[in-house]
């Protein structure tokens, strides 16, 4: 593997000194880029794009050609794990992801097998190794997975949900059944992420997109508990370096202290949290990633500049901050505005690292 030339992102996650705040964007390889749309059209559909290692590599690299970013993130989907469990993932226009065979009974959950990441998920591993090779050490590669709770919401509901009625019914009516599912998912995700590291991922992120839908105590029982299990089982060193782990619960501002106790290296923040307040609460334990509202990218370059300045000022001096959006970039954002965002981070952050 080529020697890493830019380790700013990894250093910030480990709270080591950096010359400026590193920056990347969630969903940086995505529909806001015309070159992504062209490659997706070539693939035919979303999952065909994910399953073609060369095209997955191409879309991973596309934002790096446009912008001076400090990390690449594997192009894939959080639902690859349940798909590999045999649920029959498909995408319905205007409806998002759906499963042909939801796991909404104890019998269906008992039948689930833990997928072999080098077999049923081998296409992801081939993409990881291809991307790592083609990056040529320019920036580190982030591997990722959905959290057990978030994956379970799709599996039990049969797809996207706003009310989470089925899975919450299971949580309170048949908690042992849900725990059985979450336990299998935690084991599956641990194997999946460790295989990503073995194939070249240099940092890991767990996306808990729907943890914020839970009550205070239910979050600890059904989400955090299983992310903790994963963190405990992850490979934390590879290629002579530490492999940092970031946890991101959308809507998780209430639980930063509990999340920081898991032993992860960093927490992702959504835009509802003041990053300076988050630093005062947990900055002694973990680095922080975030957290500009993605909708700010619809604003003028001047407004974007102002928002970046405010977040940097709130965090203050020193390392331990990776600049990002508070969630994925919207598909209708002008790529020029994303460029304004990244340039503003470069321009404004150096003074906080002298």
UniProtKB/Swiss-Prot annotation:
Named in its record, the pathway it takes part in is: Porphyrin-containing compound metabolism; protoporphyrin-IX biosynthesis; coproporphyrinogen-III from 5-aminolevulinate: step 4/4
Binding, substrate: 27-31, 77, 154, 209, 327
Site (described: Transition state stabilizer):
77
Report whether Lyase shows up as a keyword of the record.
yes
**Top enzyme category:** lyase
User: A GO molecular function for this record?
Assistant: uroporphyrinogen decarboxylase activity
Listed InterPro entries: UROD/MetE-like_sf (IPR038071), Uroporphyrinogen_deCO2ase_HemE (IPR006361), Uroporphyrinogen_deCOase (IPR000257)
Q: Which gene encodes it?
A: hemE
Name the Pfam families for this protein.
URO-D
* Keyword Cytoplasm attached: yes
Q: Which family does it belong to?
A: Belongs to the uroporphyrinogen decarboxylase family.
Location in the cell reads:
Cytoplasm
What is known about what this protein does?
A: Catalyzes the decarboxylation of four acetate groups of uroporphyrinogen-III to yield coproporphyrinogen-III.
| Assembly and interaction partners | Homodimer.
Q: What is this protein called?
A: Uroporphyrinogen decarboxylase
Q: Which UniProt keywords apply?
A: Cytoplasm, Decarboxylase, Lyase, Porphyrin biosynthesis
Q: SUPFAM superfamilies attached here?
A: UROD/MetE-like
EC annotation from Swiss-Prot or TrEMBL? 4.1.1.37
Q: Which organism is it from?
A: Shewanella halifaxensis (strain HAW-EB4)
Assigned GO CC terms: cytosol
Q: Which reaction does it catalyse?
A: uroporphyrinogen III + 4 H(+) = coproporphyrinogen III + 4 CO2
One biological process term from GO is: protoporphyrinogen IX biosynthetic process from glutamate
